[in-house]
Regions:
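Short, compositionally biased segments
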Residues: 164-167, 284-291
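Solvent-exposed beta-strand/loop surfaces of large extracellular or lumenal domains
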Residues: 290-299
Length: 299
């Protein structure tokens, strides 16, 4: 790995990229070997975008450079640079098969980045960022946003929808990881990714990934039927909203919990058949049954 900057910025460069070796080791340990022979990071002034990625090379804005006394800027810089490195695996070496699979490539790259940042900053920081992202998705996905995957649409996603796709996709993959992990086989999404990257080493034909093939590999590795999950979270739009209430039943000496689910996106399109066909809002998300529990006696 090599990093380049303009003269006079060497000290900030060393501080900014000091963690990249740990990121490379993490990705290679969990997601197979690095797919290229080298990696260069170039900090450029007045770059039109914050970052531009290509094979073995990432152009990054000098605004991300920081000294050892920086606090808030550290997370943004490490998020951007670790994501740039993850894109070498998913996004550059392995690409989407169709435009409708863009959510998967972008989401997997961000999911890999999130796992590394969880190790780097700790589980509390990771869950805090996850919670904030969930709140933003819930506020946005109320009927105006399309599904993150539209297989029958050959056109690329609208530019205004891409930030939302990049926000929701890693959260959907996080839910999928939890679903696979609770299947009883102790198989999570990292193992599925490792298998995907391992198959990509065989030949160029395996360097294009589709939503269908990804779900097929997940089902093959874990044995979990993901059709309902895919229809709700991938091919459908909207997010569930839950309301809970609790009542103490004196006769049964138990707390009875009732749960009510609402889907704002479905309510938004309920009276418009045409928009329901386009946006595919989910009327009801699958949930697990909650059972009452007996309180502990106190003496």
């Amino acid at each position: 790995m090599h990093a380049f900057c303009l003269p006079g910025q060497e000290s900030q460069l060393a501080t900014t990229v000091a963690f990249l070796r740990a990121a490379m080791n993490f990705y290679q340990t969990h997601f197979n070997s690095y797919p290229f022979g080298s990696y260069k990071l170039v900090f450029v002034e007045e770059l039109p975008t914050q970052r531009s990625d290509s094979a073995t090379l990432a152009l990054v804005s000098t605004d991300l450079l920081h000294g050892p006394d920086a606090i808030d800027q550290v997370y943004e810089a490490r998020l951007c640079l670790s994501h740039a490195l993850a894109c070498q695996w998913m996004g550059i070496n392995m690409q989407q098969k169709n435009w409708s699979d863009l959510w998967l490539v972008n989401g997997l790259g961000l999911y890999m980045t999130g796992l590394f940042l969880c190790k780097l900053f700790g589980n509390n920081e990771y869950r805090f960022r996850l919670k904030k992202d969930m709140e933003r998705v819930v506020e946005s996905d109320r009927g105006a946003m399309p599904p993150i995957c539209r297989p029958n649409n050959p056109e690329p996603p609208d530019a205004a929808a891409i930030p939302f796709i990049n926000l929701k996709a890693p959260l959907v993959l996080h839910i999928l990881d939890r679903k696979l992990g609770k299947s009883g086989t102790s198989v999570g999404l990292p193992r599925v990714l490792n298998k995907i990257f391992l198959e990509g080493v065989v030949g160029d034909t395996n360097l294009y990934i589709s939503t269908h093939s990804f779900l097929r590999i997940c089902r093959k590795v874990s044995g979990v039927d993901l059709r309902t999950f895919a229809d709700q979270w991938i091919y459908g739009s909207g997010c569930p909203k839950f309301g809970f209430s609790a009542v103490f039943n004196r006769k049964k000496m138990a707390v009875e919990i009732s749960m009510q689910q609402e889907c704002p996106a479905y309510i938004f399109h309920e009276k418009n058949d045409r928009s329901k066909i386009i946006h595919k809002p989910v009327p009801f998300f699958e949930v697990r049954q909650l059972h009452g529990f007996r309180p502990q006696q106190s003496y």
